[in-house]
């Protein structure tokens, strides 16, 4: 995929439209959001592993995200990381969410190989070393699927004057999709990098990507790590 440049406008080749829609792609107005790349979601002994899913599906995005992260760090783009987890006293954990997790054998707050499952401050809750934030990068701790719900993400984006959001992380069909929809409804121009996302079910991953593209890009556009790195101004 090639970059397209028109009179100081920059586009990433994407489907169903070159992104961003207006070509206003700059380090000062664009943020990379890396969603929930935590041991609990993609590491041995974590929440997803405890539920018996194939870890290779949620580990596949690690290397592509590393390449995107390195490129965007080098060019001075805003970097934001998210972590899903709950307070140690579980005061922010809905009863039905805990019930569902216990029902499938991985109760949130219960002891696990990486500490209490999806609990803030535990080893499994933290971001994996390969993608760990560096000084100056924002970390958003969230109690739910969406990165805007019960967090200060919107305030951070407004303070940084962000217009464009590039979404990566896991899982495509749950936390990434929810965050993309939340951002789109708030007027942010969104791009999903399909090889930088993963899900516990590959069919769900593909379905989530397909839904982004419907109706001319109802939630934004879709590209990949190679196209982004090649065209990034």
Curated annotation (Swiss-Prot):
The keyword Hydrolase applies. Keywords: Hydrolase, Plasmid. Changing residue 41 to Y: 138-fold decrease in catalytic efficiency. The active site is at 36 (proton acceptor), 142, 175 (nucleophile). Gene3D superfamilies: Isochorismatase-like. It catalyses: biuret + H2O = urea-1-carboxylate + NH4(+). The keyword Hydrolase applies. Changing residue 41 to A: 540-fold decrease in catalytic efficiency. Strongly inhibited by the sulfhydryl-modifying reagents N-ethylmaleimide and iodoacetamide. Inhibited by the substrate analog N-carbamoyl aspartic acid. Changing residue 175 to A/S: Loss of activity. Biuret binds at residues 84, 145, 170-175, 215. InterPro entries: Isochorismatase-like_dom, Isochorismatase-like_hydrls, Isochorismatase-like_sf. It is an enzyme of class 3 (hydrolase). Its EC number is 3.5.1.84. Optimum pH is 8.5. GO terms for molecular function: hydrolase activity. Homotetramer. PANTHER family: FAMILY HYDROLASE, PUTATIVE (AFU_ORTHOLOGUE AFUA_2G08700)-RELATED, PEROXYUREIDOACRYLATE/UREIDOACRYLATE AMIDOHYDROLASE-RELATED. Belongs to the isochorismatase family. Involved in the degradation of cyanuric acid, an intermediate in the degradation of s-triazide herbicides such as atrazine. Catalyzes the hydrolysis of biuret to urea-1-carboxylate (allophanate) and ammonia. The substrate, biuret, is formed by the spontaneous decarboxylation of carboxybiuret. This is Biuret amidohydrolase. It comes from Rhizobium johnstonii (strain DSM 114642 / LMG 32736 / 3841). The gene is biuH.
């Amino acid at each position: 995929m090639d970059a397209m440049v028109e009179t100081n406008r920059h586009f990433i080749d994407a489907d169903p439209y070159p992104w961003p829609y207006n070509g206003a792609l700059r380090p000062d107005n664009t943020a990379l959001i890396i969603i929930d790349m935590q041991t609990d979601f993609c590491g041995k002994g974590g929440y997803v592993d405890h539920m018996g899913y194939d870890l290779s599906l949620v580990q596949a995005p690690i290397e592509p995200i590393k390449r995107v992260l390195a490129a965007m760090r080098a060019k001075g783009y805003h970097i934001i990381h998210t972590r899903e987890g709950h307070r140690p006293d579980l005061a922010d954990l809905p009863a039905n969410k805990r019930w569902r997790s216990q029902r499938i054998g991985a109760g949130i707050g219960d002891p696990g190989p990486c500490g209490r499952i999806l609990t803030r401050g535990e080893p499994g809750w933290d971001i994996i070393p390969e993608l760990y934030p560096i000084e100056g990068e924002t970390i958003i701790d969230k109690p739910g699927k969406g990165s805007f719900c019960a967090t200060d993400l919107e305030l951070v984006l407004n303070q940084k004057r962000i217009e464009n959001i590039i979404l990566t992380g896991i899982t495509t069909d749950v936390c990434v999709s929810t965050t993309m929809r939340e951002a789109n409804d708030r007027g942010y121009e969104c791009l999903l990098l399909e090889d930088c996302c993963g899900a516990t079910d590959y069919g769900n991953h593909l379905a989530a990507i397909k839904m982004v593209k419907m109706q001319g890009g109802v939630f934004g556009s879709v590209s990949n790590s190679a196209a982004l790195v090649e065209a990034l101004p």
